[in-house]
Amino acid sequence: MTHKTFPSWPDVAPQLIETAAGRSPADTVIRNGKWVNVHTREVLEGHDIAIKAGRIAYVGPDASYCTGPETEVIDAEGRYMMPGLCDGHMHIESGMLTPAEFARAVIPHGTTTMFTDPHEIANVLGLEGVRLMHDEALLQPVNIYTQMPSCAPSAPGLETTGYEISAEDVAEAMTWPGIIGLGEMMNFPGVAHGDPKMLAEIAATQRSGKTVGGHYASPDLGPDFAAYVAGGPADDHEGTCEADAITRMRQGMRAMVRLGSAWYDVEAQITAITEKGLDPRNFILCTDDCHSGTLVNEGHMNRAVRHAIDCGCDPLIAIQMATINTATHFGLEREIGSITPGRRADIILTSDLKTLPIEVVIARGQIVAESGSIKVECPHLDWPESARGTVHLGHTLAATDFELAAPEGANAVTANVIGVVENQAPTKALKAELPVRDGLVEGEGDVCQIALVERHRATGGVTNAFVSGFGYEGKMAMASTVAHDSHHMIVVGTDRTQMALAANRLAEVGGGITIFRDGAELALVELPIAGLMSDSPASEVAANAQKLVEAMQACGCTLNNAYMQHSLLALVVIPELRISDLGLVDVRSFKKIPVIEPFNE
C-alpha cells in the first residue's frame, strides 16, 4: 500500500526560508485578500499569502518580492482568506460513503481536515476494517486523521459485535502513520469503575503521546463524571445543554458541540460563550454523524459554522471553533488550523464571514474546489472481498421470526417501549398497554414493532421489542444494516410479513437500507462495503437516500432525518432505552429489562 506523503515542516524549512527572504519565488501567491487571523481573532485587510511546497512561507501586505515568472498568482479580489475547516469528531461511515467519496463530498464545502473514528466498520470487520479506512484516508488530497476505535462492543455484556477490539489492537494501531489518538471512549461506566481493558487502551494511547476521545452520555455530573475525567478522556461531544458544556470545560475537557444530520446540540450549549462569556478556546465544532443527503444539499463544517453564527456566536469565534481550537486540541496547531508560516496551505476564499459561501478551497497549496465543484481526484482503495458480503442471517427469515408471545392468559400487556425523540440521540423509556391477539402481542396506534437481527455470525437470532414516535401507518417495514454501533440488522415495522421481506432483501444485496409496503419495495440504498458504505458518488447515494425519505413519509413518518434516528435505536451507550441482540437495554442502569412487564392474572 503506497500512501501519499506530505513533506514535514522541517523537510521544507530551507525552501520556506528562501521564499520568505525573497531569494526564491513562491509556487503560488494569493494576492489582495482579507487575512482571517485565528491566533489574534482579527481580520487584516490588504494581505498576500506566499505558498511553497504546499506550506505557507509568508503572510503580509505585499508578496510581490517573492513572486517569480513561474509563480501561480490567485487574485482574492478583496475576499476573506480563512483557514480550511476542521471536523473535530466524526464517523465517515455515517455518510454511507467510503473515505474517498466522503472527501469528494466535503472538500467543496471547505473541509480540509477530518478527525474520524471508524468504529462503525470496527464492529463489523475489526482491525482489518479500521486499517482499510485508515489507508484510504491517507490517499486523499486533504487531511484525514484516524482515531483508533476504543469500544467494540460499545457496552460489553449488553451486545455482541462482529469483532472485539483489544488493548493490544489499540497499541498496534498507535504505530500506524495516520493514527492521531483513541476514538470516543463510549464505555464510560467501564472507565469510571476502573475496567482494566479500558484503562489499558487509554494508557497505550497516552504513552504514545496521543489524544483520548470522550463520550460521556449521562446527565449525572457527579462522582461518576469526575472518575471518567480522571481516567483520561480529553473531549466530549455528548453534551446537550449549557451546563454540560460548562462542566466539561471547567474540568479541562474540550466541549465538542455537534451539528450533524440528526444532532442539533449547538444552540443549547453555545450560550456558555455568547451569554456566560466563558473562554471559547475550549469549544470545538464537529458533526459526529452526517448522512450523504446533508453533505450534498446543506454542507458540512461550513453548515456547522454558519449555524453557530446564527445562534449568536461572533463569526471569528465560530471560525476558531472549527480551525485553531481543533488543531490545538490534537497537538497540530503547528501543522494546521491557521494561515501562518510553516502550516499546511489549507485556505478558503469567501466573500462573507457570516453566510460563508465557499468560493475557492485550497489544500496543501493546490486548488481542490472552486464554486462548489471538486477539482482533484480522490483515490479509492481496491476494497477486498472480505469487506463485502457481510450480512449473514443463518436462514431465510419468516414472519414468525418477528412474533412476540404474550404471557399465557393475557388479553393485554404492559410493554416497555423505546420512545424516539426528534433531533436528539437520547430516547425515552416509555410504557404502553398493548393488545394480545391469538397469543401474540401487537403494536397499536403509534407503537410498532422493532427487531434486531444478528448478522455477523449467522446465529439466526432475532430480538423483538416495541418502539414509538415514527408515526408509521399501513402494512410496512424498514430494515437497515446500519445499526449503531453493533451494526446488526435493525427492522422496524407495522407488519411482520413486511419485516421479513425487508430483512431478506438486505441479505440478498449484501447490506443497506430498504423499505417495504404491501409486499413492494419502495426504496433501497445499497451499502455493499461492510453493510455500511457505498463506493458510489455521494450524489448518487444521496439521491437514493432521498427516495428512502420520501418512502418513509409515504408510510406516515414525518420525523426530521428519520432514517438516522432509525439507525440509532441499538446504540446501547446513550440513554434511555435501546435494543440489542441480547435484549432490551435500560441505559440509565446498564441492565437488560423485559419487553413485557410481569403479568398477574
Curated annotation (Swiss-Prot):
Its EC number is 3.5.4.2. This is Adenine deaminase. Belongs to the metallo-dependent hydrolases superfamily. Adenine deaminase family. The lineage of its organism: Bacteria, Pseudomonadati, Pseudomonadota, Alphaproteobacteria, Rhodobacterales. The keyword Ribosomal protein does not apply. InterPro entries: Adenine_deam, Adenine_deam_C, Amidohydro-rel, Metal-dep_hydrolase_composite, Metal_Hydrolase. One of its GO terms (molecular function) is adenine deaminase activity. It is an enzyme of class 3 (hydrolase). Its cofactor is Mn(2+). The keyword Transmembrane helix does not apply. It catalyses: adenine + H2O + H(+) = hypoxanthine + NH4(+). GO terms for biological process: adenine catabolic process. It comes from the Bacteria. Keywords: Hydrolase, Manganese.
